[in-house]
Amino acid sequence: APTSDRSLEGVSQKKLELYNKYYTALVHLEQRVKHTKWCILRYPNEYFSRKSNMSLNDFKDFYYKVCNIDYNKMKIAMEPLKELMNKTDKVHIVAPGTDLIFSIKDIPAEKYYGTFNIPDGEVATCPVKNSVNGYITYNTKTKYNDIIFEDIRFDFIDGKIVKATAKENSKTLNEILDTDEGARYIG
């Protein structure tokens, strides 16, 4: 189990790109995910309790409760949302720092209920590629290749991120989005 979220600190961006290209893409995504049975479980420890701002005992109690829910019951309870999403065309999200509209028409919704991840629970789909317009701001920190990004804002026109900013590391964020022609699109 991890003890830090900075385990890759000091590794060059070039080496991280090679790792993602030759290990993550080829070994993990192409071989392991597609050809083996797997389930991801992040065992509760001090690191995860700190990240959750909880004591270790409180975090363990919370974690085991969400891991031991009735996933078959969840699967059934998700069906009305899946049906609604499958007949929905336009989605409009409005929140502080966000006004985003897109289509999910004819993109099938999928239910996730403990088959590959524990804990789990979501009904997911994605936008029609060129339908995303507006902007979204993320109010939580995120990490990519050991770089922390905070207050990310993406502005979209016809599905493409045309402007990307962050509190810090905006230049790096845009370099990541410029890695290939699909990186500025959702889906």
Q: Which stretches of residues belong to each language-model region?
A:
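Generic secondary-structure boundary/loop-capping signal
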Residues: 115, 133, 141, 170-174, ...
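Short, solvent-exposed amphipathic alpha-helical segments in soluble enzyme
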Residues: 108-109, 152-155, 178-180
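Short, catalytically relevant binding-site loops at active-site mouths
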Residues: 108-109, 142-144, 169-170
